[in-house]
Regions:
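Active-site-adjacent betaalpha module
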Residues: 1-5, 24, 28, 32-36, ...
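Active-site loop/turn elements of alpha/beta-hydrolase fold enzymes
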Residues: 11, 45-47, 131
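Flexible, glycine- and charge-enriched loops at secondary-structure boundaries
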Residues: 19, 23
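Short, conserved beta-strand edge motifs with alternating hydrophobic and charged residues
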Residues: 7-9, 40-44, 76-77
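Von Willebrand factor
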Residues: 33-49
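Flexible, glycine-rich phosphate/dinucleotide-binding loops
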Residues: 15, 49, 135
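Short acidic, Gly/Ser-rich segments with clustered Asp/Glu that frequently serve as metal-coordination loops
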Residues: 12-18
């Protein structure tokens, strides 16, 4: 494996139904990453807050969406927005000397935003795959793409990097 990783964030059953618009391209990104000897990593969210019903551990809602292609056992669980708060994921990044990330998944205004911000703050190269992310509020996607760029991420379509 090289020092790059595709990170697929929170494509779980409780996520927005808008994921259906990006699942084909996301699966293409997974194939591309695997073919290029990149680490393919899956992040799932577990909501431990008592007052909420989504992303609860051991529920169907917390499972990955059935259409998502799983090509590795690099599956990590987070309980906060930023994927790097998962100690297991952070240890994996360190152990594999990963310095460059390609980001896919949801939600563009929450977990992807926090993860990208913190990755760039920590000095990693971050590429947001604009046709592999979505949000509950798709009207905010253009604003989020500008935000990612303003924080040091590159924003590319999958076809531009393949």
């Amino acid at each position: 494996m090289n020092n790059k990783a595709l990170v697929v964030i929170d494509l779980q059953n409780d996520i927005t139904k808008n994921y259906k618009e990006i699942i084909e391209t996301t699966n293409q990104a997974i194939d591309w990453a695997a073919a290029n000897n990149m680490n393919v990593v899956y992040i799932r969210h577990h909501n431990l807050s008592a007052g909420t019903r989504t992303f609860k551990p051991d529920t169907r809602g917390a499972e990955f969406v059935p259409e998502l292609k799983i090509v590795s056992d690099h599956i990590f669980t987070k309980t906060k927005s930023n994927a790097l708060t998962s100690e297991e994921f952070a240890a994996f990044v360190s152990a594999h000397n990963i310095t460059e990330f390609f980001i896919a998944g949801a939600d563009a205004t929450a977990c992807i935003k926090s993860t990208c911000y913190n990755m760039t703050k920590d000095g990693y190269a971050v590429h947001v795959l604009s046709d592999c992310i979505t949000s509950y509020d798709k009207k905010k996607l253009p604003e989020m793409l500008e935000y990612y760029a303003s924080k040091g991420c590159t924003v590319d379509k999958l076809s531009e990097i393949m």
